[in-house]
Amino acid sequence: MADVSSTELKAAYDEVLADSNDTNWCLFKYEGKNKIVLSGKGSGGFAELAQEINQPSERLYAYLRVVSGDDESKRSKFVFISWCGEEVGPLAKANVSVHKASVKQVIKNIGVEVHYTVADDLNEEELMTKVRKSSGADYSGNKSTN
C-alpha cells in the first residue's frame, strides 16, 4: 500500500470536484518509494495536464474534470489517470496497480479510468470519446421541435 495521508491530496481532489472554482485537474507524484504527494493542479484542462504528465521516468496519478454531453444535457465527468512512463523500472511499474488502490481511497468519484505510458497516448479526442461512451444518454439526435 502507498502512503496517501497528505491532506493536500484530499483538498486538491475536492477542489477539482467543486464547480465553484476553475481548478479542473490535480496531479499526484511519488516522494520516495511509497509516499504519494500533490505535484500540482491547474485550470487548463487536459492539454495543460498532459504537459505535466509527460514524464518518461515518473509514475503519476491525475484527476481531471471535463464537461461532456450534448446540447440538451451538459455535465461534469471525472477522469482518473494513471501514468507510468516507459523509463520506469519493472518493480516500480508493478507497484502502480497496487498503489492505484491506495490513491482511490482519496479519489472516489470516477467516471472514466485510463492508463498511459507514452506521450503518444495523451490524446484529448480519444479521451473525450471514452467519456462520451461512458456517459449514457445522448439526446443530440432527438431534438424537440415544439
UniProtKB/Swiss-Prot annotation:
Q: Does the keyword Cytoplasm apply?
A: yes
| Membrane-spanning residues | none
User: What start and end residues bound the annotated signal peptide?
Assistant: none
Pfam families documented for this protein: Cofilin_ADF
Residues covered by the ADF-H domain: 1-132
GO terms in the biological process aspect are: regulation of actin filament polymerization; response to bacterium
Instruction: Name a GO molecular-function annotation.
Output: actin filament binding
By its UniProt entry, which CDD domains does this protein fall under? ADF_coactosin_like
Top-level taxon in the UniProt lineage: Eukaryota
Q: Which InterPro entries match?
A: ADF-H, ADF-H/Gelsolin-like_dom_sf
Give UniProt keywords alphabetically: Actin-binding, Cytoplasm, Cytoskeleton
The entry's comment on post-translational modification says: The N-terminus is blocked.
Where it mainly occurs, coarsely classed, is cytoplasm
The GO cellular component terms are:
actin cytoskeleton; cortical actin cytoskeleton; phagocytic vesicle; site of polarized growth
Q: Which compartments is it annotated to reside in?
A: Cytoplasm, Cytoskeleton
Keyword Lipid biosynthesis listed? The answer is no
UniProt record similarity statement:
Belongs to the actin-binding proteins ADF family. Coactosin subfamily.
Q: What does this protein do?
A: Binds to F-actin in a calcium independent manner. Binds to the filaments along their length.
Q: Identify the PANTHER family for this entry.
A: CORTACTIN AND DREBRIN, DREBRIN-LIKE PROTEIN
The protein in question is named Coactosin
The gene for this chain is coaA
